[in-house]
């Protein structure tokens, strides 16, 4: 489990990351082109659909959703009040509902939403299988769930940093989790920013599936287990995990500059 892959550690990580999330993180790691490609798999084909965006953060993914769906039908959920507060500065999200909550214990009734979307959130979940089972539970029968997350890097240095930071599963794990949760027609879509050049290992995955019948997920899950750490362990996790995560920014920035120079030649 990654050092920031815990509820309290992730809460404080985003307390600080929210200050520059839209300026530094999205342009490098979760671009408008990636968002558009991923949201195609959510089947946002009717403005009247009800949609929940789990791990909505500052609303970057939500902005892509409300370009197709009436904002009054969209619910943004996040455990970080600081991220959600930043989303209020975006006028297109003014009519969205905002809920503080846990992706692994969603505060919604079973069969509540036509569409479930979650982008860049699963990597912080201590129990990703439980989170996917919750995605199944709150989606209406016949509805679609879409989850976007990172993939284990091919580069050894990046892989070591990723392992220290948070959850970076191999692509096939996403498919396994969706299938085990009960979703049908499970599909994987590879995503990458323009600077990413590895054709053999995807940068990120969008996994989608359809809920075939009403009710909760048939997945058999063990009891929840993410006991809070003591002060020293928490501090060590937070500092070391944040440092590992911060290292990705200059790496991505350098690769992005190289890619831009290559396109100009």
Region locations from a protein language model:
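A short acidic, Gly/Pro-enriched loop at the edge of an enzyme's catalytic core
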Residues: 104-115
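Conserved beta-strand signature within the Rossmann-like core of class I S-adenosyl-L-methionine
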Residues: 142-149
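Short, glycine-/aromatic-enriched active-site segment of Class I SAM-dependent methyltransferases
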Residues: 149-166
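Core SAM-dependent methyltransferase catalytic element
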Residues: 194-232, 264-265
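A short glycine-rich, Lys/Arg-flanked "PGG" loop and its adjoining helix->strand segment in the class I
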Residues: 129-141
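Class I SAM-dependent methyltransferase SAM/SAH-binding core
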Residues: 50-105
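Short alpha-helix
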Residues: 167-182
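Conserved class I S-adenosyl-L-methionine
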Residues: 1-45, 60-64, 83-86, 154, ...
